[in-house]
Amino acid sequence: IRRQRQMCIRDRLYVEHINYVSQAPSVQYRGIFINDEGWGITPWAGRTFDKELGDIGPKTYAKVCELILRMKGNMLAPAMHPSSGAFNKYPENKLVADSYGIIMSTSHCEPLLFNNVTEWDKKIMGEWNYMTNKEGINKMLDQRVLENAPYENIYTIAMRGIHDAGLVGVPKDKEVNLVQEVIADQRGILKKHIDSPIDSIPQIFVPYKEVLDIYERGLRLPEDIMLVWPDDNFGYIKRLNNKEERSRRGGAGVYYHISYLGEPHDYLWLNTTPPALMFEEMRKAYDTGAKRYWLLNVGDIKPGELGMKTFLDMAWDIDKFDFDNINNHQVDFLVSIFGERYREDIEDVMNSYYHLGFQHKPCLLYTSPSPRD
């Protein structure tokens, strides 16, 4: 029962002045990627905050931006599946992000903030094929940068197929040269619309899936572009900086999953990535120079709340964590909610949960049609 409290009116308010200087965060850009949103946040948003849109819209993104700030993050890669409207479909979305001081990024397959899943109309725009429709593709990318340049963004330099597919219509022996051309063209678009030196405009290159092979076959990446290493979709980072890459001016980062939709199998309903595994991988990445950009694929947000908190707390202060205390992090948070008297019970539940989930992810146990069907 909520107690009614009598309002007391005062004519003066005194606030104690305390000098406080915040520490510098361990990682410069720290944020989340909303992904595979069709089963959770999209229908929820359409029935609650953004009823008039029936979609994820500015009212929902305001709550997401507030959440990111409360967790000491500063960056968002928005939802981009066909089940939701593209972030830039609703002009108010970027105004909301800007009002919260949130830096907008995008996934590995969205060049220059363009979501080709729902914003590319094949009937009007033609094939998403850079070999045959370069002019049409760059026309859309040019328009997107023109519209979004006034805001703070991190631009993905990329060319893949539609959504999470590989390059279309490109012979393997021409892939490196084509991506090299793409990089030059997209940087040209940035130079055209942003009144800053190109090496001061935040850009990322994510060698995800087949792109890692293209990168390792001799792709020449400009020194100022951040090199963002992906994991294998199951929590193990596939590649770390070598000696030469550690000295790159653009620095490096990590794209990490605690939720995944794709081959060989999805895991969406439960976050079973152990904190110790996440710490081991992110600490290795940090120690080898991946400390400029950390992006967490958090799926629908709700199932991954604890993992998201651990990830962003590490991004804020990685040195607070070690192998002796990492398993206490989520326990301490839950104890702060439910009370110290439940600490042993919470420890037992969390240890058993991650032990069982690490042995075999529950989402991988079924052989019936996947959630996508």
Regions found by a protein language model. Give the residues of each.
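Feature activates predominantly on carbohydrate-active enzymes
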Residues: 2-6, 10-131, 149, 205-207, ...
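Short conserved micro-motifs at the rims of enzyme active sites and ligand-binding pockets
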Residues: 43-45, 167-170, 217, 238-240, ...
